[in-house]
């Protein structure tokens, strides 16, 4: 597991709150579980809780700087630069973690060949790769997460969603395509005060 980790300054925190993208069933939740496992091996006495938010931005806002906490963000997220540039945050670790299986799911038998598909923006390119023969994309609806995309199918708002096997199971959906994971790099941010090795500003810029 350590071979997939770059630990820059994760501390021996006794209680840690992990903030990331929800709801339950997202790849981010799975990545948070992987990070929890790493913490347990590195710091056996750590007690970890996971807090899921409907966006990475809301997850960041939910962090309480008075207690140890981290924000886990997929590097495929188009706006991840905002967290790297945030003066309140520091990058404390990165790790490689393959997502759960991704695929196209439906609620039942499809009555159309022209599909309205819900997806999070990040894995958009997978739609054409996974789309079964005989179907075409009529429109794409962006959701806040892959799990939210699955929920849109369950509510009958769209025909199909690009989502994870975990979210498909939660919402009782079935795959209509082949599936595959995504090899992903994840960034772990913490409030500056919990960074054990803060970045030093060069004297020439002070």
Where are these regions (language model features)?
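Domain-level signature for soluble enzymes in the chorismate/prephenate branch of the shikimate pathway
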Residues: 1-206
């Amino acid at each position: 597991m350590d071979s997939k980790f770059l630990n820059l300054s994760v501390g021996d925190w006794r209680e840690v709150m992990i903030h990331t993208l929800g709801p339950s069933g997202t790849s981010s939740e799975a990545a948070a579980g992987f990070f929890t496992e790493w913490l347990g091996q590195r710091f056996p006495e750590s007690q970890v809780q996971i807090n899921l938010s409907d966006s990475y931005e809301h997850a960041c806002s939910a962090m309480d700087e008075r207690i140890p906490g981290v924000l886990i963000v997929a590097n495929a997220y188009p706006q991840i630069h905002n967290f790297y540039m945030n003066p309140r945050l520091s990058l404390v670790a990165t790790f490689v973690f393959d997502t759960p299986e991704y695929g196209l799911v439906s609620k039942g038998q499809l009555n159309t060949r022209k599909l309205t598909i819900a997806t999070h923006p990040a894995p958009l390119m997978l739609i054409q790769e996974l789309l079964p023969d005989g179907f075409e994309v009529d429109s794409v609806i962006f959701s806040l997460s892959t799990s939210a995309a699955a929920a849109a199918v369950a509510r009958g708002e769209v025909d199909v969603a690009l989502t994870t096997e975990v979210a498909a199971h939660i919402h009782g959906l079935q795959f209509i395509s082949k599936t595959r994971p995504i090899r992903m790099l994840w960034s772990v941010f913490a409030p500056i005060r919990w960074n054990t090795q803060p970045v030093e500003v060069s004297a020439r810029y002070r």
